């Protein structure tokens, strides 16, 4: 009987060739999901995957448990089997202050001779997900379980097999007989937002936060559902290990070894020695928190030396050699006192929760957005409820849950207005949209005010001498009705306003005069066309080059512009069909607003064409906005963070962590002068 590796079918395809195809797909998955550096386009990966599926369909006897096709998922389960952890998955003690961190360091002095303040620690972000155990037997994923109570968890093997960045087979020649990888499964913020958006479109229940979404996804009885969820694993340690080869002697080196055999490990892990470096890591990660792209709730600090870890040992539920230094709480409970309804620039009616003030994530919160009527219904919230407030980074505080058992008897239902609270025009909700809108248009004072505030904002016309309070006064006295009226103001008129002296009035007029010289992209953005943001305005300017061409563009021509679909194209067409809008634009131009028409840049052979670029540091010859606009004219994607997908980093003066990360990843770094030279600008 021939060996399995020598078997072949009637077409001449051998098992060895099939296995080579699997190995190629595993390599592509590793580079795509772990290194974030795809080797081939998605279409090529899909073609090879289909080829493998067809071959395995013809030869079911050739299917192996570690085949990439086996991620698709098994049949739905009736329930989860229990798994006993050979080595308990203990939790960590927490520290919430520098003093508590000092206490952690002091406690170690009783168990080791070394000074804890001179020890090396492996420092990791504390990921906000679900702890899991993944067992590899002879290099093949064999079993996965949740942490559960630390002793017993649930068997989630079928679901873990669907997580794209978890290898089904280790990337090594002589794998351990048994290797238990421990890590955190979480959902990146972008994936979470997309998941909730799709749920809303389907009228399904949304998740309150990424952690709940990750946990709910892993505990699906149908693995095919889990497969559709954007889950990610980051390993943080090793449990069971059986092999003739010894593991590295430090925790940091063990994580690097895991990474080398295909197990994903977080990129922010660092070594630190002593109290000051530990605190510096904490501060650094806290500062990065809003831009990481995934939720963390603190740092995890572990003694790096494995021998010292063993000396320090454990207390009843946690190791003595590690601690979680947590950030200030991002969720707190408070009472919903009332709901007010605000009217935005486009007429959107937004319910705003008025809360009993509560301290959350370092600030006192008394207001929180409720988004729209659907969100109120989803939460099942009423006035008087005790609610859970969440504030993450710079995100506007939001209500994520209701404590039903605390609902008072006098709780009051929230009534969504049928008439605008400002102008009393009818409020309507367009089919397919979650937002209700005032139909008053610019008849509505709230919409006029917000439109003017948008027009003068920094990224629009950048009239820094005209702020929100001045706009309110100008509108109250009916001195300004449209943006064009700003350019008709006189010194004597401004002098009659409250807290407006001669110098302040002149500064405002100087800012207004300066704003007349702008760019086509800024002007388009300032007009406040619904869904035309900075990037879309820049794309329109780059595509059509002048305002007349944009005004004359048809629905079909507009859709030829990058990122302009049917909805946005329709809104642009409708904007120019409204006589009032045309009058305002012509009035603005008659007041002297001007710009240079966009010159089509020859980018056929330019190295910047279509690249992903990050700006960092202080630029001296261009403003940040000018540099961004210049890059976009070359079709560049301007990103805020460095990754392996970044093509160029443009580094100005005092470039910091982004420069270091770019150098670490081998990203091409340009000085400001080199960047300008590439663009051909003088």
From Swiss-Prot:
Active site: 126
Top enzyme category: ligase
Binding residues annotated for Zn(2+), in chain numbering: 420, 423, 438, 444
InterPro entries registered for this protein in UniProt: BRCT_dom, BRCT_dom_sf, DisA/LigA_HHH, DNA_ligase, DNA_ligase_AS, DNA_ligase_CS, DNAligase_adenylation, DNAligase_N
GO CC terms in record: cytosol
Domain BRCT: from-to ranges: 603-682
Cofactor(s) the protein requires to work: Mg(2+); Mn(2+)
Record carries keyword Magnesium: yes
Gene Ontology MF annotations: DNA binding; DNA ligase (NAD+) activity; metal ion binding
Residues that coordinate or bind NAD(+): 42-46, 91-92, 124, 147, 184, 302, 326
Enzyme Commission no: 6.5.1.2
SUPFAM superfamilies listed in its UniProt record: BRCT domain, DNA ligase/mRNA capping enzyme, catalytic domain, Nucleic acid-binding proteins, RuvA domain 2-like
Entries under SMART domains matching the protein: BRCT, HhH1, LIGANc
Reaction(s) catalysed (UniProt annotation): NAD(+) + (deoxyribonucleotide)n-3'-hydroxyl + 5'-phospho-(deoxyribonucleotide)m = (deoxyribonucleotide)n+m + AMP + beta-nicotinamide D-nucleotide
Keywords noted in UniProt: DNA damage, DNA repair, DNA replication, Ligase, Magnesium, Manganese, Metal-binding, NAD, Zinc
Any GO BP: DNA repair
Protein family according to the UniProt entry: Belongs to the NAD-dependent DNA ligase family. LigA subfamily.
Function of the molecule: DNA ligase that catalyzes the formation of phosphodiester linkages between 5'-phosphoryl and 3'-hydroxyl groups in double-stranded DNA using NAD as a coenzyme and as the energy source for the reaction. It is essential for DNA replication and repair of damaged DNA.
Protein's recorded name: DNA ligase
Organism: Actinobacillus pleuropneumoniae serotype 3 (strain JL03)
Name of the encoding gene: ligA
